[in-house]
C-alpha cells in the first residue's frame, strides 16, 4: 500500500507541478551566423565541425540577402553582378544588425517568389545534419529588400512628425494582401528544405509612426469603429538633437498599438501555417526585443510587440534579444544594473512560457566596433541569465573571432 501511495504521489508531481520548475531535457545550444568567412563548402564544413566541438547543437543561419548585407564568399551570385554601390552612412540602422557589404538582394534557397542569390541552403543543411547539428533558417518579413525593390508600391505608410503628414516608409506594408501572399510563397518554398526550424528576423514589428497605409486604416476602422488619425494619437511632439519625440500617447494610440500587435501576430500565424502545409513538424522562433520582456508597455508603444498576444499563437520558441551592450548604451545603466536586469528578464519570461520555449540571445560582438566582446564579459552575462532560470542559449553573431572555448564552457555549465 505504501508503495502504491508513493507511485501515485510521483505521478501527481510529474503531471501537476508547474512546467517552469523543471529544466528541459534537450537544451538548445545555439549560435547565430550572419556571415561566414569561408571560400568553399569544405571550409564551411570545417567551421561547422569546430562549432560542434564547442558544444553547439543548433545553427541559426541567415538565408536572406538584403541590399547592404555581405555575400557569403562560398556563394555564387548570378551574372551580371549585383550593384556594388556603397551602403549609406549609418544612422543607427536596425538595432543589433551588422551592416556593410555589397548591394543586391534575394535569398539563398530556391523559390519562384524571390530572386535567388545561390541555392546554398541544401548543402548547409546536409553539412549541419552530418555533424548532428540542427539548422534554423533566419528569414526576413517586412524588411525584404528584394520585394521592396521589385514593388515600391508595396511600401508601407508612416506618419512624419517633421511635416505632420503621412508619407511612404521603408518597409513592406503587411496590410496589403499581395505582400502576404508573396511572403507565404517564399516561406512555403523555404519549408521544402530539410531544415529544423525558422527564426523570424526582428523586422516583424510596427514602430510608433508605422502602419498608416490605407489598407491598415480601413481595417482598423472596420474592427474598432475608430479612425486611425495621427492627429489624435500623439500629444506634445518635440524635437531634440535632430530627432522627434512624443511626450504623451493618447487612449486612441493605445487602441491602435494593441490592434497592430494583434495584426502582427496574425501575419506571423499566416506565414507559419503556409510553411507547415509543406512541413507540419517545422519549428518557429520569434525574435523579441528586450523591451518586450523588460518594459511591455514601452514595447507595445514603440514596436507593437506584445508578449501576451504572441503566446496565444503557435511559436515554438521566443528568442529574447538580451543584447547587454546595446541595452547599456540605450538605457544608460551601469554594468551591475544591466546584469541584474538580465536575470529579472529571464525570470519574467519563464513565468509566462516556461523554460523550454525560451532562447536567450547573448551578444558576443560590439555592434559599433565590430570587435569580439571579452570572454569574462560573455561569461558574466551568461551567468546572470542562468541565475534567472535554466533556459536555452544562443550566442550572436558568432564569427571566426568568437572565443569558442568560452562558449563550450558555458554550454557545459
Which residues make up each language-model segment?
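Aromatic-lined carbohydrate-recognition surfaces of secreted/lumenal glycan-active proteins
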Residues: 136-141, 199-206, 238-239, 249-303, ...
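Substrate-binding cleft of secreted/luminal carbohydrate-active enzymes
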Residues: 307-413
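Glycine-biased, low-complexity coil/linker segments
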Residues: 91-96, 100-103
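Aromatic-lined carbohydrate-binding/catalytic grooves of carbohydrate-active enzymes
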Residues: 56-83, 103-117
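Glycine-rich, aromatic-flanked loop segments that form ligand/cofactor-binding clefts
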Residues: 58-61, 120-165, 199-205, 281-283
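Active-site-adjacent "subsite" loops/lids of carbohydrate-active enzymes
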Residues: 26-28, 136-193, 250-253
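Aromatic- and acidic-residue-enriched segments that line the glycan-binding/catalytic groove
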Residues: 72-80, 105, 144-166, 202-243
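Catalytic domains of carbohydrate-active enzymes, especially glycoside hydrolases
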Residues: 44-69, 193-197, 310-318, 387-388
Amino acid at each position: 500500500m505504501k508503495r502504491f501511495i508513493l507511485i501515485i504521489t510521483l505521478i501527481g508531481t510529474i503531471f501537476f507541478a508547474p512546467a517552469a520548475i523543471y529544466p528541459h531535457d534537450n537544451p538548445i545550444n545555439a549560435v547565430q551566423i550572419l556571415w561566414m568567412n569561408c571560400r568553399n563548402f569544405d571550409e564551411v564544413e570545417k567551421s561547422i565541425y569546430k562549432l560542434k566541438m564547442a558544444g553547439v547543437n543548433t545553427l541559426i543561419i541567415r538565408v536572406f540577402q538584403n541590399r547592404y548585407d555581405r555575400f557569403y564568399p562560398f556563394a555564387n551570385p548570378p551574372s551580371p553582378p549585383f550593384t556594388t554601390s556603397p551602403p549609406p552612412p549609418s544612422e543607427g540602422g536596425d538595432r543589433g544588425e551588422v551592416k556593410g557589404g555589397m548591394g543586391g538582394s534575394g535569398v539563398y534557397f530556391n523559390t519562384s517568389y524571390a530572386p535567388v542569390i545561390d541555392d546554398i541552403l541544401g548543402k548547409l543543411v546536409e553539412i549541419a545534419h552530418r555533424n548532428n547539428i540542427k539548422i534554423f533558417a533566419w528569414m526576413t518579413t517586412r524588411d525584404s529588400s528584394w520585394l521592396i525593390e521589385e514593388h515600391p508600391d508595396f511600401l508601407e505608410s508612416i506618419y512624419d512628425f517633421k511635416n505632420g503628414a503621412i508619407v511612404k516608409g521603408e518597409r513592406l506594408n503587411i496590410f496589403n494582401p499581395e505582400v502576404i501572399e508573396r511572403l507565404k510563397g517564399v516561406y512555403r518554398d523555404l519549408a521544402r528544405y530539410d531544415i529544423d526550424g525558422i527564426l523570424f528576423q526582428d523586422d516583424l514589428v510596427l514602430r510608433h509612426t508605422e502602419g498608416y497605409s490605407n489598407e491598415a486604416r480601413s481595417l482598423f476602422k472596420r474592427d474598432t469603429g475608430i479612425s486611425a488619425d495621427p492627429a489624435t494619437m500623439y500629444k506634445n511632439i518635440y524635437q531634440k538633437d535632430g530627432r522627434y519625440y512624443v511626450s504623451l500617447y493618447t487612449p486612441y494610440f493605445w487602441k491602435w498599438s494593441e490592434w497592430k500587435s494583434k495584426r502582427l501576430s496574425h501575419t506571423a500565424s499566416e506565414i507559419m501555417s503556409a510553411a507547415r502545409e509543406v512541413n507540419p513538424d517545422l519549428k518557429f522562433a520569434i525574435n523579441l526585443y528586450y523591451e518586450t520582456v523588460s518594459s511591455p508597455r514601452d514595447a507595445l508603444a514603440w514596436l507593437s510587440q506584445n508578449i501576451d498576444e504572441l503566446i496565444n499563437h503557435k511559436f515554438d520558441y521566443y528568442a529574447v534579444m538580451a543584447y547587454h551592450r546595446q541595452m547599456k548604451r540605450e538605457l544608460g545603466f551601469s554594468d551591475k544594473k544591466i546584469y541584474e536586469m538580465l536575470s529579472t528578464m529571464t525570470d519574467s519570461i519563464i513565468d509566462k512560457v516556461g523554460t523550454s520555449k525560451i532562447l536567450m540571445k547573448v551578444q558576443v560582438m560590439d555592434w559599433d566596433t565590430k570587435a569580439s566582446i571579452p570572454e569574462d564579459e560573455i561569461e558574466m552575462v551568461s551567468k546572470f541569465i542562468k541565475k534567472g532560470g535554466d533556459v536555452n542559449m544562443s550566442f550572436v553573431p558568432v564569427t571566426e573571432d568568437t572565443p569558442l572555448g568560452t562558449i563550450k564552457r558555458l554550454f557545459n555549465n
